[in-house]
């Protein structure tokens, strides 16, 4: 990895909420009622330069998931991992392993 690349990755990871807001803006164009959260190593403060930013989108428009993914991955330069879930999937799956302090809503 080049020093420039490492520096850019550290900046993205350190400013993860800025990246998450960028993702949220894109998602809200498709689903204005979606909720967007960040979780994982960046929230815990345990990231490395090879980490990504885990972003969870809770949407009732799950049929738009491919469109959401394409738009985000096309427009966002930062290393993000997009997770899309219905409210039911969030409550039945993600809530099983995410503690409240490990997930942050993007405002």
Language-model-detected regions and their locations in the chain:
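Glycine-rich beta-strand-to-loop/alpha-helix junction loops that act as flexible
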Residues: 39-41
């Amino acid at each position: 990895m080049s020093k420039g690349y490492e520096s850019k990755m550290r900046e993205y990871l350190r400013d993860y909420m800025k990246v998450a807001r960028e993702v949220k803006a894109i998602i809200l164009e498709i689903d204005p009622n979606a909720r967007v959260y960040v979780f994982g190593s960046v929230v815990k403060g345990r990231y490395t330069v090879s980490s990504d930013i885990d972003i969870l989108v809770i949407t009732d428009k799950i049929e738009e998931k491919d469109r959401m993914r394409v738009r985000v991955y096309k427009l966002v330069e930062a290393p993000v991992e997009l997770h899309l879930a219905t409210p039911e999937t969030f409550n039945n799956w993600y809530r099983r392993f995410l503690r409240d302090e490990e997930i942050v809503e993007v405002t």
